[in-house]
Amino acid sequence: MENVFDYEDIQLIPAKCIVKSRSECDTSVQFGGRTFKLPVVPANMQTIIDEKLAVSLAENGYFYVMHRFEPETRIDFIKDMKARGLFSSISVGVKDEEYAFIEELTRENLTPEYITIDIAHGHSNAVINMIQHIKKHLPDSFVIAGNVGTPEAVRELENAGADATKVGIGPGKVCITKIKTGFGTGGWQLAALRWCAKAASKPIIADGGIRTHGDIAKSVRFGATMVMIGSLFAGHEESPGATIEKDGKLYKEYFGSASEYQKGEKKNVEGKKMYVEHKGAIMDTLTEMEQDLQSSISYAGGNKLDAIRNVDYVIVKNSIFNGDQY
């Protein structure tokens, strides 16, 4: 690893503008045989996504990944999405009952368009075996596997049959893996993404560490096809987290997938809970993300997302906020 850096250490360098208005810029992305409005997906976490929001995102042309923390609801969810004429995108773990679940889908003739195998340390035989199991029983499902943080892991999961890999170990705002274990991509997530993307032959999802909309453009520059985001999507009207009022202000809870709130027990805890200010409607945030990304594309000197992949950059080592708490 030569240069190690994170999002706030990088500035992208503008190229000559070719559009009259940023509204001419197209932020859409192809992923798994579908076109989505943005290269952005809300994290598959219990306080970020639920069935209702999944329907809304799919209806409006956005990608989503349903979480895996209410496993018994997944079959009905897939049936419901199919009945609505929408794509289904679910998450699975690697425990024995998940193998049985995949076989049950085959028996019921249900093929989710997307299946995300989602565990904290995705470079493992457990994930490789699950990829192969899904590919055997549901060959038409697009399999996303993760999470990983090295080129070796990306290559191995791709070779096992993964259609995309998810990169990021512990950079999230409610993830404390970096503190509890000493491992992960926290603090150098963007460099890890770049390192992994160079090894990849299939799409990569950058997962975690996004704090501003500009970080989406930076992720695209360093090889992400999709960018998974938790904290920026937490706290919306549609977010599943509980709402509380404090000093006349509204907040919503947001917790990590390996937190005790998630697990219902204090065992191998690598996540925490926080309260985020209530942010209004999620579609407004998605619109703002789109507008900001359109601006990014115009600064990149193009009118499509791919223009961002070709710009130069500088490493500024944490100075872009000049010590401001952004």
Swiss-Prot record:
EC number: 1.7.1.7
Gene3D superfamilies: Aldolase class I (3.20.20.70)
Active site: 175 (thioimidate intermediate)
Protein name, as recorded: GMP reductase
GO biological process, one term: purine nucleotide metabolic process
Cited InterPro entries: Aldolase_TIM, GMP_reductase, GuaC_type_2, IMP_DH/GMP_Rdtase_CS, IMP_DH_GMPRt
Keyword field contains NADP: yes
Function, as annotated: Catalyzes the irreversible NADPH-dependent deamination of GMP to IMP. It functions in the conversion of nucleobase, nucleoside and nucleotide derivatives of G to A nucleotides, and in maintaining the intracellular balance of A and G nucleotides.
Single GO MF descriptor: GMP reductase activity
Organism taxonomic ancestry: Bacteria, Bacillati, Bacillota, Bacilli, Bacillales
UniProt organism field: Bacillus licheniformis (strain ATCC 14580 / DSM 13 / JCM 2505 / CCUG 7422 / NBRC 12200 / NCIMB 9375 / NCTC 10341 / NRRL NRS-1264 / Gibson 46)
The entry's keywords: NADP, Oxidoreductase
Binding residues for NADP(+): 204-227
Gene Ontology cellular component list: cytosol; GMP reductase complex
Annotated catalysed reactions: IMP + NH4(+) + NADP(+) = GMP + NADPH + 2 H(+)
Family: Belongs to the IMPDH/GMPR family. GuaC type 2 subfamily.
Sections of the chain in a coiled coil: none
Domain of life, source organism: Bacteria
